[in-house]
């Protein structure tokens, strides 16, 4: 009887250790996913700003640094708001509002601020932030239905 009890105790401790190990592994994977997403968003923002500023320097841009700063103000507010959102419905409302604001600034610059590369970067920033919150699939474009860029 003691042997059976000892074996059961040993199995219980062994299984408990595996669950903790699996829990810890899953937690580490989730933390890494968030860290990688944030890093990617920051890298995309750096590339986006560089592209916009570099085009101003060519002298062909129909927008200025003030417009670039306004664009980034919109994007940064989006990232804060979506991070603090509590539901998918709220998150998608934030996406819609952000895209409409970006449409307006792009229209104000004669549709020159957000070109192909900028469009890709902005959409990816928004989509990754939504994905991080679980509002969309990683390859789903949640901006498409509202954007004019």
Language model: regions and residue ranges:
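Sec-dependent signal peptide recognition
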Residues: 1-7
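Signal peptide cleavage region of secreted peptide precursors
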Residues: 17-21
């Amino acid at each position: 009887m003691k042997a059976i009890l000892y074996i059961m105790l040993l199995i219980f401790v062994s299984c408990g250790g595996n669950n903790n190990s699996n829990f810890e592994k899953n937690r580490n994977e989730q933390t890494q996913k968030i860290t990688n997403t944030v890093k990617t968003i920051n890298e995309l923002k750096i590339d986006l700003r560089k592209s916009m500023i570099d085009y101003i320097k060519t002298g062909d841009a129909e927008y200025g640094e003030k417009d670039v700063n306004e664009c980034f103000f919109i994007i940064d507010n989006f990232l804060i708001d979506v991070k603090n959102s509590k539901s998918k419905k709220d998150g998608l409302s934030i996406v819609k509002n952000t895209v409409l604001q970006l449409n307006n600034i792009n229209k104000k610059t004669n549709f020159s601020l957000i070109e192909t590369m900028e469009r890709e970067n902005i959409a990816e920033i928004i989509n990754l932030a939504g994905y991080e919150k679980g509002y969309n699939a990683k390859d789903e474009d949640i901006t498409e239905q509202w954007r004019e860029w």
